[in-house]
């Protein structure tokens, strides 16, 4: 009989603290003396920290861990690792090293932990990185993830809020994994839904990031726990508004049905509360699509703002690599509402 791990109430990126609460806490942290080599820190909404160490090299640092959202230990390890590695790719970087972060009950079968860590190690190897160590503590619930270090040229960093009017928005993965995993937790996921979700969550964003280096990318982020609309809102600046074409959004098999059947998450509601007043939905947008756009993603895709004249060629290369990428909208000059969904 296969060994399984127990689902947690908030597995994957649904376990994140809400953005409002997090912003409140971070605002109170002391800044200390400004270091000119810290190119990106926690005072921005970017996906990782970036520290310049020479004229042609900067270190990219990130970490991510969470409870399980699937019952197979090896698959959970793969997903958790792919999710942690993604932040390096979102910054335009290359993965170098990773450290395990482990919380594990002392009375649980250690073979389960071994499978989780094997799944994570295999993804680090696939990313071209080296698993260099880690840290573990005894805990009441299973949690796993990675601290990851990568490198990027200081002049080629992808920031998330440097998009320009007329940029085309390209998303590299489907949305809706939170809805599907929530339905699967109670055995109600539609046929083929969890398989599609797992396939998406275990796919590295490495290929998408590497392909992007040949194009004029103005901004990038990865879509994770704060949802498509939450992370899109972090890409906005004073000069731009986002116009989203909901029909073009790639969606996980069965996710819209899961929304219609109210397999919703508290994290999605937090996302709606946080960013909902920045979004204008057209009257014909169904509730299920709204929920997909507010749905917390685990190991979600990259969202690129690319120069309009290069968008078609970029999308062609992404699709040629087997990615379910799509043009999902564009930036225009600032309007009354930050985000319009049509």
UniProtKB/Swiss-Prot annotation:
Keywords: ATP-binding, Kinase, Magnesium, Metal-binding, Nucleotide-binding, Selenium, Transferase
UniProt GO BP: selenocysteine biosynthetic process
Catalytic activity annotation: hydrogenselenide + ATP + H2O = selenophosphate + AMP + phosphate + 2 H(+)
Residues that hold ATP according to the record: 16, 44-46, 64, 87, 134-136
Cofactor needs: Mg(2+)
Presence of keyword Nucleotide-binding: yes
EC number assigned by the record: 2.7.9.3
One Gene Ontology cellular component: cytoplasm
Binding site for Mg(2+): 47, 87, 222
InterPro entries found in the cross-reference section: PurM-like_C_dom, PurM-like_C_sf, PurM-like_N, PurM-like_N_sf, SelD_I, SPS/SelD
UniProt KW Transcription keyword: no
SUPFAM superfamilies in the cross-refs: PurM C-terminal domain-like, PurM N-terminal domain-like
Gene Ontology MF annotations: ATP binding; magnesium ion binding; selenide, water dikinase activity
N-terminal signal peptide: none
Superkingdom: Bacteria
Residue positions of the active site: 13
Site feature Important for catalytic activity, where: 16
Gene3D superfamilies on file: PurM-like C-terminal domain, PurM-like, N-terminal domain
Cofactor binding description: Binds 1 Mg(2+) ion per monomer.
CDD domains for the chain: SelD
Subunit relationships: Homodimer.
Cited function: Synthesizes selenophosphate from selenide and ATP.
Family membership: Belongs to the selenophosphate synthase 1 family. Class I subfamily.
Entry protein name: Selenide, water dikinase
Species for this entry: Agathobacter rectalis (strain ATCC 33656 / DSM 3377 / JCM 17463 / KCTC 5835 / VPI 0990) (Eubacterium rectale)
